[in-house]
């Protein structure tokens, strides 16, 4: 009988029919799932942060592209002005020049109004009408992103640029003396007016009406912002505190008794005045007194 020779497999050979080791343990699978879910959560959070960073302007500004009324609606003469041309010749900003009567008390002076960052110039019409009764030329305009001005997303930086452009229009195009231009900011515009006064300290006076608290302070009341690193992401601060503490331009702060704007007044450098308005009182007398004190030759 022939002897069967035993076959020796080559080194490294494994029998495919032999029992196999499990491909993965349950712990490994759970770890992989957890890592995937964690990575997805991080990606979602980063995406949320990026979306917030891109759309944060909507928490600050409430622009309208509609101009429903003009000074003529209120019986005032005015000129519609387009100014601040780009390198390609596009006029970016649109505003209204409302002249004072030739024999008015401040016929050679101008008040540059910086509105509150909501609506359009039409929404400022009641205030423009009141300011016109002071007997001073009034120039008001819409920031980019508002009214008939260039359609872009506004930001703190662009509003400061637009205020500078309005100042240049008055001094370079209309050839007005900087010492005859009073800055008046309302709401959010108060911070813009303060920054403009810092950049153009030839202005004889600065009026801040109903100044808002810094934007970051206001955002703490918005629950959507509690899960995000707001101070890292938010670049629109509108905080005039430090500027007002150093600025030597005469200031008038007009605000309601219930507002927190009094802290601006407490920290502001002299000279300064305040008018606390309660129960719908008229603040025009305070404005008249302030203008009479600080406008040259008034």
Give the residues covered by each predicted segment.
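Membrane-embedded segments
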Residues: 88-170
């Amino acid at each position: 009988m022939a002897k069967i020779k035993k076959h020796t497999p080559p080194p490294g050979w494994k029998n495919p029919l032999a029992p196999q080791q499990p491909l993965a343990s349950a712990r490994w699978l759970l770890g992989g799932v957890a890592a995937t879910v964690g990575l997805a959560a991080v990606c979602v959070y980063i995406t949320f942060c990026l979306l917030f960073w891109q759309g944060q302007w909507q928490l600050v500004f409430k622009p309208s592209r509609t101009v429903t009324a003009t000074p003529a609606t209120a019986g005032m003469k005015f000129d519609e002005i387009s100014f601040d041309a780009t390198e390609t010749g596009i006029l970016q900003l649109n505003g209204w020049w409302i002249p004072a009567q030739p024999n008015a008390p401040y016929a050679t002076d101008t008040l540059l109004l910086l509105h509150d960052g909501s609506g359009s110039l039409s929404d400022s019409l009641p205030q423009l009408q009141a300011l016109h009764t002071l007997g001073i030329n009034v120039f008001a305009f819409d920031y980019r992103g508002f009214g008939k001005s260039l359609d872009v997303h506004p930001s703190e930086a662009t509003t400061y640029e637009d205020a500078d452009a309005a100042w240049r229009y008055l001094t370079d195009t209309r050839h007005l003396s900087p010492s005859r231009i009073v800055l008046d900011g309302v709401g959010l515009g108060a911070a813009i007016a303060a920054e403009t006064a810092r950049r153009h300290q030839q202005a004889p006076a600065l009026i801040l009406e109903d100044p808002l608290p810094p934007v970051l302070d206001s955002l703490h009341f918005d629950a959507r912002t509690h899960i995000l690193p707001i101070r890292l992401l938010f670049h629109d601060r509108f905080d005039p505190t430090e500027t007002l503490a150093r600025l030597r331009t005469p200031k008038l702060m007009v605000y309601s008794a219930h507002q927190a704007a009094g802290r601006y007044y407490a920290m502001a450098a002299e000279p300064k005045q305040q008018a606390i308005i309660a129960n719908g009182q008229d603040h025009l007398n305070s404005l008249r007194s302030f203008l009479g004190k600080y406008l040259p030759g008034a």
